[in-house]
Amino acid sequence: MTDQNRPEETQARAARFIRHLRESADTEDRPTVMVLAFEGWNDAGGAASSAVRSIATAAEAELAERIDDEDYYDYQFTRPRVRRNGPHREIVWPSTKVYRAQPESAEMNLLLVSGVEPSFRWQSFTAELLTRAAENDVSAIVLVGALLADVPHTRPIPSSLSSEDAALQEALDIDEPSYEGPTGIVGVLAHTADQAGIPAVSLWAAVPHYVGQAPSPKAQLALMRQLEDLLGLTLEVEEVAEDAEAWERGVDDLAQEDSDIAEYVQRLEEASDTPNLPEASGEAIAREFERYLRRRRPPEA
């Protein structure tokens, strides 16, 4: 059955995303999507930045440029590091790195942006990043974040997609963001990109707040799977999945040693165990099966 003949609701999210970007640009060329994550306030458990770095490694991304203007960083908060490079020592300054990738498993090119949330001049920083996006003909931006929440570590990590762009909401069947309150650089970039005419998607995962320290491989895995579905990637997640299982066992052991924590986790489990969990939906199960088939598919000769 051809893609055109399949019901809309059964087509992969990545295919809908690609088609929307091509139709918007009136071209059949591979679109370029910028994916960003920042360490700091938007990155509970280091899950978002770890997910984007994992994609950069898997896609064999090459470093394209750095944004290291010292006006953006408070070096007492984000300190430079000293490291040895052969017989010499060097200073590594905080920066935002931009990587370029053309993953074979996807129908799009990627600009992967990873760094530390800047301390100062956010408006100038976002303007500089959006200038880089325009220079590279970026068709859409994906912002990746993780937040602390009242969720149990024993259940699937909740994750969500949203966009301020009405056309993307319809194409991807996602909601408009409803959050109001303090925001980080991820929220600023999502709104600024939309105002600049670059459609933006925000992807967030909820990290159990009682184990919010890094690493958080279970949340990282949830974000990587969402990015697989959205970008059409095929990622090797076995190592991260093993880390997630070990992490969950470790938290189980800690909870068993403290009756108050164990009781609290049980209350969170009861609150989350509803019949309408998105992880149990037909669409979620279908996406998981598609991932399984992609990983089993032999490479083309």
Feature roles, as predicted:
Residues E65, L111-V113, V142, P199-W204:
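Hydrophobic/aromatic beta-strand patches that form the interior of the parallel beta-sheet core
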Residues F38-N42, L112-W122, L172-E180, Y210-A214:
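Flexible, glycine/proline-enriched loop segments at strand-loop-helix junctions
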Residues M108, V116-A167, L189:
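Internal, conserved structured core segments that host functional sites
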Residues D3-G115:
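N-terminal short beta-loop-beta anion/metal-coordinating cradle
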Residues G46-S50, F120, S124, E180, ...:
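Conserved active-site and cofactor/substrate-binding residues in soluble primary-metabolism enzymes
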Residues D150-L230, T234:
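Catalytic cores of processing enzymes, dominated by hydrolases/peptidases
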Residues V211-A301:
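A conserved C-terminal secondary-structure "cap"
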